[in-house]
Amino acid sequence: MRIDGRENKQLRPVHMEKHFIKHAEGSVFITVGDTKVICTASIDDKVPPFMRGGGKGWITAEYAMLPRATEQRNVRESSKGKLSGRTMEIQRLIGRALRSVVNLDKLGEKTVWIDCDVIQADGGTRTASITGAYVAMVLAFAKLMEEKKLDELPVNDFLAATSVGIDPEHGIILDLNYAEDARAEVDMNIVMTGAGRFVEIQGTGEEATFSREQLNELLDTAEVGIRQLIDIQRKTLGELAMQIDIKRSEESGDT
């Protein structure tokens, strides 16, 4: 048994509450164990200067943590006057991941602003942010469709993320909490689509090297978790999930 009593390939309890923020076009409050993140998607009717006139949309993300999201208080980055390298990396990861499953041509010249605010951190904040932000983004697109500002849902697949690692006592484990992450010999963040395609693989041998065989098992374990996360996304999105399935079939030619 792991630190919190889970099996090696078991996710922490996951819950998504949609429409959590009333002003945002799309919003989700996601909890993954004791990690809690508010994800919102806001629509801006313009694109960055480098994209003007191209007819395509854009998706970008911001990520932040409350000072007491962690055990010891952190100074707000706004007080420091600059973002940390970690924050910039996570913001780019979230935006990159979401863009991978959206047809930006069908979005038109609009920008989707994703905001992921961690209110409590216990490991896996970036993967929880991606998983929740995806749902918030789809909800925002649905609102645009209701308002006749989009003709169709521009999303062509599901998207979710989780962590895997090699624990010195338990071996390969899924969805690391903070204590597990701190002692892991190897840890990875994996982002995948509903079709089982990889969007991002971030892996590091913190205290040890790892073999190709272990890498394959890590990826297989991540896929187990991501399939479960996508099932939760489906339940949260309801009928919108069926529209995404249709889009995926059309894109792959499996109609």
Curated annotation (Swiss-Prot):
Q: What GO terms in the biological process aspect are recorded for it?
A: rRNA catabolic process; rRNA processing; tRNA processing
EC supergroup of this enzyme: transferase
Documented EC number(s): 2.7.7.56
- Write out the residues that bind phosphate: 86, 124-126
Q: Please describe what this protein does.
A: Phosphorolytic 3'-5' exoribonuclease that plays an important role in tRNA 3'-end maturation. Removes nucleotide residues following the 3'-CCA terminus of tRNAs; can also add nucleotides to the ends of RNA molecules by using nucleoside diphosphates as substrates, but this may not be physiologically important. Probably plays a role in initiation of 16S rRNA degradation (leading to ribosome degradation) during starvation.
UniProt subunit comment:
Homohexameric ring arranged as a trimer of dimers.
What HAMAP family does its record include? RNase_PH (MF_00564)
Q: What is this protein called?
A: Ribonuclease PH
Q: What is the scientific name of the source organism? A: Geobacillus sp. (strain WCH70)
Q: Which gene encodes it?
A: rph
